[in-house]
Amino acid sequence: MKSTVEKLSPTRVRINVEVPFAELEPDFSKAYKELAQQVRLPGFRPGKAPAKLLEARVGRAAVLEQVVNAALPARYSEAVTASDVKPLGQPEIEVTKIEDGQELTFTAEVDVRPEIELPDLSGVAVTVKPVTVEDSEVEAELDALRARFGTLKGVERAAENGDFVSIDLSATVDGKEVEEAATTGLSHEIGSGQLIDGLDEAIIGLKAGEEKVFTTKLAAGEFAGQEAEVTVKVGSIKERELPDADDDFAQLASEFDTIGELKDSLTEQVKGRKRIAQADEIRDETITALLDKIEIPVPEKILEEQIGNNLHEAVHGLDHNEERLNELLQEQGSSREEFDKDMRESATKSIKTELLLDVIADKFDINVDQQDLTERLVLMSRQYGIEPQQLVQYLTQQQQLPGLYVDVRRGKAIAEVIRQAKVTDSTGADVDVDAVLGPRRGGADEAGAEAEAAEEKPAKAKKSADSEKTDKSEKAEKKSKKKSKDDDAE
């Protein structure tokens, strides 16, 4: 077999392949065996009919067609391997000549990874936000925790932001009742924004037993996107009372003995989330810095496929109704033209990033082993709240394991670049890249992965093993006493 490569553009080639018929003998043998099972000839058992009789029955052209169709994929793969091109997507194959007994020739046009020349990676410099925790952020975390242990108390006043109300709802569109919008005794936290637009504003100021009519656009159902007159009636109003932020609360709501220890733990949790955000920023800024230095042509066919996939995802929640998408964009002060432009720019950057990271992975000869994949699968299973084996089963069924391999390899590639780059925060301080990336080996060796894994671990008090049982006993006793005092108060 002979093959040559024509470069049609920086991202597309035509591979010309010539296959002597002598090399197709195994394909002919296979074709005759398959035909022998399919075609019944008098006097011969299934699978035993001679090739000449089979050919006489179905015709030489049918045999050739079967041989060629079976031979093309393998011969194309051989030609790709011999040419050292890196295809992107499926080829467009055209048989140009079948000279029976002599030669088969075909061409395969395919998008390929362009040649990308990497700059000196040690010259890459990025600046990111520092990891700092404000007292107000810790207080917000503490308030959120207190809210989980709060109690609701009925009030005899107008509803305010943050109150919990029981409401009845009904709606009409052009005088027609919207049945799916009618409900009674619905519990709602004012200010949560979890229900329809305009509801919170309508409720605030109402007392129990009062109602109000307001106009809003329905987001779902038969009348989605249409203006509706909504009537809301308040049944009851309750406010949430928060427990005092003291040592008793710390013991009730956590494994800590003092409010100071609890605040320290909350501080570390906030810091952990900010480290994840910083890691993501380092990754994004590093990629942007590289893309600014390198010209990367994008295959047009691959780009159009990516845009099509992104659009499919965008309208999936709208029952694939692009008119509804256009209406939503208009409501947001945007337009379909701006949306399409942003989508094209986003898809272009995404493809350039993937091409770039693949080249970097090749440069550093990055491999992905079983431990790499296991680490990533464990991390993903924590995020999704399922067992790793369930995740593996799902990815296998969806044929997404090869994609996972590629993602891990690209993650390790950007980690190598970050290690060579100069990373500082906006205060001018150097960022500890090793703390961001974690250990060099492993699939979690990606910006943010180590910090993300750490975020999953619950904060724990640093106590010695010898005192652990005593601490638990004392804490149980304190909680018991606190509960008794609360019961007496009631």
Curated annotation (Swiss-Prot):
InterPro entries: PPIase_dom_sf (IPR046357), PPIase_FKBP_dom (IPR001179), Trig_fac (IPR005215), Trigger_fac_C (IPR008880), Trigger_fac_C_sf (IPR037041), Trigger_fac_ribosome-bd_bac (IPR008881), Trigger_fac_ribosome-bd_sf (IPR036611), Trigger_fact/SurA_dom_sf (IPR027304). It comes from the Bacteria. Residues 454-477 have a biased composition (Basic and acidic residues). Gene3D superfamilies: 3.10.50.40, Trigger factor ribosome-binding domain, Trigger factor, C-terminal domain. It is found in: Cytoplasm. Involved in protein export. Acts as a chaperone by maintaining the newly synthesized protein in an open conformation. Functions as a peptidyl-prolyl cis-trans isomerase. Residues 433-490 are annotated as: Disordered. The gene is tig. It comes from Mycobacteroides abscessus (strain ATCC 19977 / DSM 44196 / CCUG 20993 / CIP 104536 / JCM 13569 / NCTC 13031 / TMC 1543 / L948) (Mycobacterium abscessus). The keyword Cell cycle applies. The keyword Chaperone applies. It catalyses: [protein]-peptidylproline (omega=180) = [protein]-peptidylproline (omega=0). GO terms for molecular function: peptidyl-prolyl cis-trans isomerase activity; protein folding chaperone; ribosome binding. Its EC number is 5.2.1.8. Consists of 3 domains; the N-terminus binds the ribosome, the middle domain has PPIase activity, while the C-terminus has intrinsic chaperone activity on its own. GO terms for cellular component: cytoplasm. Coiled coil: none annotated. Residues 162-243 form the PPIase FKBP-type domain. This is Trigger factor. It is an enzyme of class 5 (isomerase). Keywords: Cell cycle, Cell division, Chaperone, Cytoplasm, Isomerase, Rotamase. GO terms for biological process: 'de novo' cotranslational protein folding; cell division; chaperone-mediated protein folding; protein transport; protein unfolding. Pfam families: FKBP_C (PF00254), Trigger_C (PF05698), Trigger_N (PF05697). SUPFAM superfamilies: FKBP-like, Triger factor/SurA peptide-binding domain-like, Trigger factor ribosome-binding domain.
